[in-house]
Amino acid sequence: MKIISGNANNKLAQEIAEHCFANLVPANISTFADGETSVEFLENVRGQDVFIVQPTCTPVNDSLMELMVMTDAARRSSADRITAVIPYFGYARQDRKSASRTPITAKLVANLIVTAGADRILTMDLHAGQIQGFFDIPVDDLTSRVVFSKDIKRTIGIIDDPDVEQVGTVFVSPDAGGVVRARKFADMFHGDIAIVDKRRPEAGKSEVMNLIGDVKGKH
């Protein structure tokens, strides 16, 4: 197994490598004067199971291009299998046509990553589950619920004792699209959910119209 890090989150890649008792593959990732991305692996990856850790976060376009160039480099270096580890999947919010003459960019990005040579995708809490269907390769959409549940439990002081009366807990979804995620958290803590009803008058702006649900006096 070989783990390779892009520039988007080298610290995360290092922690993953340490957890797996592995070393990061050294790589030269540079930018030419005209802005082009250049990649060279400094270790043999032939026949290896390669994991490329590169969330496509800000700057999204640069991170995405770097991921694709690294994936292509691994493929042309004869890696046996290439897994793109993308904790944050950029363009995920563009998963459908928002108007008559707009693209479905999440699908385009999926096509680009597959064409670059990825055999498998590892991501976390996709904005919309249907994005998994945009790929023609396996996609593992991991959840952060187990990690966050420990902090939530500690923060609100939940006690594992059915005889102790506790203040109600409510999980608020910021929009209709997050209801399923909020419901899963609520089920874990036997809580309720609330939904923020909002509208987007223009790109990048939202207005809260209503709060659906009861949050008074609750965590």
Question: Where in this protein do the model-derived segments appear?
Answer:
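PRPP-associated nucleotide enzymes
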Residues: 1-219
